[in-house]
């Protein structure tokens, strides 16, 4: 059994190279595969391996005070979904190219999966405001599934989101907007940018779609959640669409 993990942390990294070297050494020591992005704004990880080795790696990482509160999302597969280990240093751990959307300067308010499920059941938030779920993912990902009635945008990359959202601004003015993505990292930046751009009615879904699946299942969601590895997509029970032996 392979344990698949997704995790990120926005935190100031003074020396990304030193962190990247340490992560690479530990991941190799524990025979993990996947991808890790390190930047001055934090770290973004997708790693898979044996349960004991995954546990040892994250115990090492979270012993660092910068990552002690990092939330790790887990799922299982019969086979390793990554071909190799890649650790890279980038300008951002998720490219958005907006100076007005830095999670190092603050965090937009969030809504938990349990609360969002109740809002979806009621068709409104706790104050009686209409609800709009904003999918911040690419069209390729949305094709595999999204929340029922979500506002989806015809974008190919995250940096396209501000322009694609502009025609919808008026329709969102009187609603509570919940931005969501796969694991939380994109909707965190998107919600911050929307706040900075004058929208004071924006929340982010805590933990993203995968966190929602993990905590409350698939209620209100149609289809699967696309992931960027050989599993292709996960259903609300976090089971992969593809679970094949790469070596066969």
Swiss-Prot record:
Molecular function terms from GO: oxidoreductase activity, acting on paired donors, with incorporation or reduction of molecular oxygen
Reported function: Catalyzes oxygen-dependent 5-hydroxyuridine (ho5U) modification at position 34 in tRNAs.
GO biological process, one term: tRNA modification
Keyword line: Oxidoreductase, tRNA processing
HAMAP family given in the database record: TrhO
Active site positions, chain numbering: 181 (cysteine persulfide intermediate)
Enzyme class: oxidoreductase
Gene of this entry: trhO
PROSITE patterns noted in UniProt: RHODANESE_3 (PS50206)
Listed Gene3D superfamilies: 3.30.70.100, Rhodanese-like domain
SUPFAM superfamilies registered for this protein in UniProt: Rhodanese/Cell cycle control phosphatase
Annotated family: Belongs to the TrhO family.
InterPro entries reported for this sequence: Rhodanese-like_dom, Rhodanese-like_dom_sf, TrhO, TRHO_N
Protein name (database record): tRNA uridine(34) hydroxylase
Enzyme Commission number(s): 1.14.-.-
Reactions accelerated catalytically: uridine(34) in tRNA + AH2 + O2 = 5-hydroxyuridine(34) in tRNA + A + H2O
Domain Rhodanese: 127-221
Family matches, as SMART domains: RHOD (SM00450)
Highest classification ranks of the organism: Bacteria, Pseudomonadati, Pseudomonadota, Gammaproteobacteria, Lysobacterales
